[in-house]
Amino acid sequence: MVEQDPFEIAVKQLERAAQYMKISEEALEFLKRPQRIVEVTIPVEMDDGTVKVFTGFRVQYNWARGPTKGGIRWHPEETLSTVKALAAWMTWKTAVMDLPYGGGKGGIIVDPKKLSDREKERLARGYIRAIYDVISPYEDIPAPDVYTNPQIMAWMMDEYEAISRRKTPAFGIITGKPLSIGGSLGRNEATARGASYTIREARKVLGWGDLKGKTIAIQGYGNAGYYLAKIMSEDYGMKVVAVSDSKGGIYNPDGLNADEVLKWKQEHGSVKDFPGATNITNEELLELEVDVLAPAAIEEVITKKNADNIKAKIVAEVANGPVTPEADEILFEKGILQIPDFLCNAGGVTVSYFEWVQNITGYYWTLEEVREKLDKKMTKAFYDVYNTAKEKNIHMRDADYVVAVQRVYQAMLDRGWVKH
């Protein structure tokens, strides 16, 4: 796990970005603090008749650009510092994608594996009752995150509707819902699909002809890792030569079939020992000689210890925070093109935005329309960041921050919250 305080890291990253832009001291001070922090107590009746008390959080980091947006995490080690940091990062992510949102995040300190489905439902509904006064389709829009899913979002939306006594617009109170109650097509694949568009554009700026026959290694084979393997091989003709999960990885220089590997993982609990592939460690996967490396699992896997051994030409950060600041510098010096996490994995929040738009208007799009709109958003954001990096001769992560913070700062100036 990460040893540094997450919110301290978020503030340091903001301060670093501020060096590359003109921003007033007062605005920077404002941006280092969340606009609203809510801590709630949620009593839940357990199946055995006893009552357990849970602590929940909702942080609305900055709403200069619009309603705050961000997931709800259920985790036994959830902390307010983590929720604040993630809310700050959501602020920058929505800004770099130019979505009309601010950033938010929610969390409950709970081990969901120890709860029955009925207990989960009571906790979900209790959380919404507790934060009801600070959320709405026009104020703060939650979504699924760690250990929460479309079913939990459905219970939460239903509770919000019951309290508000409103129907259709209330669909937009939460995104990541099941399709039957206002979910969007394309949401499952959104993170990977968005990442694929940024990889496509990255190869253009590197002057590659196309991606056919190029190699990719993917660390992590959850939702994003699987969909990325499938999309890059089937739509772009890339060779997925290695994938891994928490138990280890597999390598086949001739390429792996995404669906067959997923089936094997579901049957055996891991991708390891997949027929026709060689078992490798997660550490070995990162250092393979491939064209594209996509860390899609956990944070801080590329550090100053192994950054010098990275041989990929593109590092696509599908996970949150997979590269440490020290490693950023090393990759930059080596001439490796990084697609930073706020940009690379922003397909998820972008399709969440599309879901909200469809809910508010009551008009639903086809899968092709969702993909086409996502492509436009991701491509524009990629060049906003890439051109800023080139212009200022800074690496992509710093450019990502500069683009995002500048947009939030401009909104704060226009509202009269701060001065130049």
Swiss-Prot record:
The keyword Coiled coil does not apply. The active site is at K105. Coiled coil: none annotated. NAD(+) binds at G220, Y221, G222, N223, A224, G225, Y226. One of its GO terms (molecular function) is glutamate dehydrogenase (NADP+) activity. Keywords: Cytoplasm, NAD, NADP, Oxidoreductase. Its main location: cytoplasm. Its EC number is 1.4.1.3. It is found in: Cytoplasm. This is Glutamate dehydrogenase. It comes from Pyrococcus endeavori.
